[in-house]
Amino acid sequence: MTICGVDEAGKGPVLGPMITAGVLVSDMSELEMLGIKDSKKLSPKKRESLFEEITFSWKTYTVVRTPFDIDSREGTMNAFTASCHADVVRALCADFVYLDACDVNAKRFGENVLRLSGSSAHVCSEHKADAKYAVVGAASIVAKVTRDRCIADLKEEYGEIGSGYPSDPATISFLTEYIRTRGEVPLCARRSWQTVQDILDRASQTGLSDFF
């Protein structure tokens, strides 16, 4: 029997892509022996180390959705995320699937993912599955490290952008200054996010020339 876990990183940030990753195993106990856990509970160095071991030892599949993809989506962000999970499930063809549900209704999320994927796999869709099941924890690590590397590339291109989250003052400062000086939204930003709309609204009210 094959088992896959699926999780995403970067659903909420205003900058950078959303990454959805899956890990396919035949025995979850091998992952458990590595001490796999939710990526958020690991140091960056430990995540990187486990990422290398996971991607070397097991089959993985990653879906990258850019800010443009996210802004162009039809429907809710939860539906968009379910479609990304479905892409991973379809690619890995597991007998049993563990999902970290992002919908308030975890069962509904699992049903939607299976329907979109066309898979006949058994599914376990739960909140905080990355902290409960090693295979989802492994997927969480792959997704998080992949996104962290994308953010590092963006920092090389744009300079200091912070973490990319709307709550990060460094991210807000970057967006505000970029829009003030360039008169446009950077390609790394999600235009449909309220954070960007608020900055654009302030810019239009004050005039870009004297904005901030």
UniProtKB/Swiss-Prot annotation:
EC number: 3.1.26.4
Catalytic function, reaction form: Endonucleolytic cleavage to 5'-phosphomonoester
Function: Endonuclease that specifically degrades the RNA of RNA-DNA hybrids.
Protein's name in the database: Ribonuclease HII
Entry keyword annotation includes ATP-binding: no
Record organism: Methanocorpusculum labreanum (strain ATCC 43576 / DSM 4855 / Z)
Pfam families, sorted: RNase_HII
Top class in the EC scheme: hydrolase
Source domain of life: Archaea
Annotated localization: Cytoplasm
Cofactors, names only: Mn(2+); Mg(2+)
Gene behind the chain: rnhB
